[in-house]
Amino acid sequence: MMSEIPKSHPRYNSLISRERLVQASKDGLLAESAMIAHGRGEAFDYLLGEKTSASALKSIKEVAKRLKRAKNPVISINGNTAVLAGEDLIKIAATISCPIEINIYYRTPLRVSKLLNLMNKYKQKISKEEVPEKWKAE
């Protein structure tokens, strides 16, 4: 279905994210409640006009500052986060030299293994990319 969604669709990113989660669920990466949790967040995004609010942006910046200043930072992720933001989180973790932990409520050895494999796949992909010119961590 991903290829059928035109990039001009106003909810393109949302629909692509949803499809990625559906596939991840079929692949055994997510808990049964993962789509419910994502849908709840999507509802709020829709109600907020699909824009990052000023307070949310302020919170994002505060988290970045705290991670950067922390003596022993750790990025803790669940299945949805691994699927939707895993690559970006690996880049952040590399920038601030911190580990990423898989922290899932409905934990099974198989799910943990699959999520670790996914994150390792992302890590291998990212390790082959060049650092952008004039890149600077802020």
Predicted regions located by residue number:
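Electropositive, gly/pro-rich neighborhoods at or near active sites that engage anionic ligands
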Residues: 1-99, 109-111
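Long, charge-dense
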Residues: 93-138
